[in-house]
C-alpha cells in the first residue's frame, strides 16, 4: 500500500466555486496525499452541479475515469477516519453543511451542498463526507513488493466479480491481520466506490495486488508456507489444516470455483462442509471462515 507519491511540476487550472485556482500536477508517481497542511486555510465552496470539478469527480464512479485519473472516491466519516489512522491524505475533502470537517487530512477542503454530493456519488442520501484519494502507484502493487514472511496469512481470490463481496473480503483480511489480498485475472475494481464502501475503511489498511493467472501460479510454486485451495470436493476438512505460516488461502467465486491451474498449484485442497441443502456459501463468507480458521490454527 503506497502512501507517498511523486514530486510536483507545473500546474493545471481548475475551478472551485467561482474562482479559478491552480491544482498541482503530479509526475508519474501519482497524485498528492501526504502534505503537512491544507493548501488553502479557508475552504472553497461549490453549490453548482455544473462546476467542472463535479464533472471530474463524478467520472471516478466509472472504471475508465479511475484509470485515467488514478484516483478513487471514499465516503463516510468512519471510513475516512480509518484512512487518516492508516496515514493517508486526501486530495479533496468535500463536506456537507453542518458536518465535521477534520475527519481526514486533505490538500483541499471544499464545502458543498447535498445536491453536489448526490450528483457525484449517484446516491439519494449521500454521506456528508466525500474524499478523493490517489490510487497506490503501480510499483506498490507489483509482486516484487510482496514480502511473504511479513505476515502469517494472505488471501488470494480468483476473478471476483461482485464489488460488495470483494469489499467484505478485504475487510475480513484486515480484521485477521492478513498481509494482503491478491486478485487474480479478471477481477472487479477494488477501488470502485461500491467496493470501497463495503470495506468500511479497510481499503486503506490492506495491501492489494493484481496479477495474471500465470503470475499467481508462479507465486504459489515458490510460496514458502502452506498454500490452501478451497473446493467443495476438497480432500480434507478445513479444521484439520495447520495453515503453516505464511499461509496463502486461495479461493474462487461461488459460481465458478477455482481454475485447475490455481488448484493444482496449491499444497492442500480444503473443503467447507455443506450440512444443509445449500450447495455453497458466497465468496465473502468463505473468505471470512478460512481467514479465521488460519488465525486460530496459527495461535
Spans of features found by a protein language model:
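RNA substrate-binding interface of SAM-dependent RNA methyltransferases
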Residues: 31, 137-234
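Short, hydrophobic beta-strand segments that form beta-sheet elements in well-ordered domains
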Residues: 72-74, 91-97, 208, 226-231, ...
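Active-site/ligand-binding-proximal alpha/beta "capping" segment
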Residues: 229-278
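Structured adenosyl-cofactor binding patch, chiefly the S-adenosyl-L-methionine
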Residues: 131, 172-176, 187-203, 260-299
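N-terminal positively charged helical leader segments and presequences
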Residues: 7, 14-124
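Short beta->alpha connector loops at strand-helix junctions that form conserved
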Residues: 112-113, 158, 184-185, 207, ...
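Amphipathic alpha-helical repeat scaffolds
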Residues: 76, 161-169, 280-286
Amino acid at each position: 500500500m503506497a502512501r507517498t507519491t511523486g514530486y510536483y511540476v507545473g500546474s493545471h487550472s481548475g475551478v472551485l466555486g467561482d474562482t479559478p485556482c491552480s491544482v498541482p500536477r503530479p509526475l508519474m508517481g501519482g497524485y498528492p496525499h501526504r502534505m503537512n497542511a491544507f493548501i488553502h486555510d479557508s475552504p472553497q465552496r461549490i453549490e453548482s452541479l455544473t462546476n467542472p470539478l463535479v464533472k471530474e469527480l463524478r467520472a471516478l464512479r466509472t472504471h475508465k475515469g479511475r484509470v485515467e485519473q488514478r484516483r478513487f472516491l471514499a465516503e463516510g466519516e468512519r471510513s475516512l477516519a480509518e484512512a487518516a489512522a492508516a496515514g493517508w491524505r486526501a486530495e479533496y475533502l468535500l463536506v456537507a453543511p453542518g458536518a465535521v470537517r477534520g475527519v481526514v487530512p486533505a490538500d483541499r477542503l471544499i464545502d458543498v451542498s447535498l445536491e453536489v454530493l448526490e450528483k457525484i456519488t449517484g446516491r439519494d442520501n449521500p454521506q456528508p463526507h466525500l474524499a478523493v484519494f490517489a490510487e497506490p502507484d503501480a510499483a506498490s502493487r507489483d509482486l516484487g513488493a510482496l514480502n511473504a514472511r511479513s505476515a502469517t496469512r494472505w488471501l488470494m481470490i480468483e476473478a471476483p466479480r461482485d464489488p460488495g463481496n470483494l469489499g467484505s473480503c478485504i475487510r475480513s483480511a484486515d480484521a485477521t491481520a492478513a498481509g494482503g489480498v491478491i486478485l487474480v485475472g479478471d477481477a472487479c475494481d477494488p477501488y470502485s466506490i461500491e467496493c470501497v464502501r463495503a470495506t468500511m475503511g479497510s481499503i486503506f489498511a490492506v495491501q492489494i495486488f493484481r496479477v495474471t493467472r500465470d503470475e499467481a501460479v508462479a507465486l504459489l510454486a515458490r510460496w514458502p508456507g502452506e498454500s490452501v485451495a478451497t473446493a467443495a470436493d476438497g480432500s480434507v476438512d478445513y479444521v484439520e489444516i495447520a495453515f503453516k505460516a505464511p499461509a496463502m488461502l486461495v479461493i474462487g467465486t461461488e459460481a465458478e470455483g477455482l481454475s485447475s491451474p490455481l488448484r493444482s498449484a496449491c499444497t492442500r485442497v480444503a473443503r467447507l462442509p455443506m450440512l444443509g441443502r445449500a450447495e455453497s456459501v458466497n465468496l465473502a463468507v468463505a473468505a471470512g471462515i478460512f481467514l479465521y480458521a488460519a488465525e486460530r490454527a496459527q495461535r
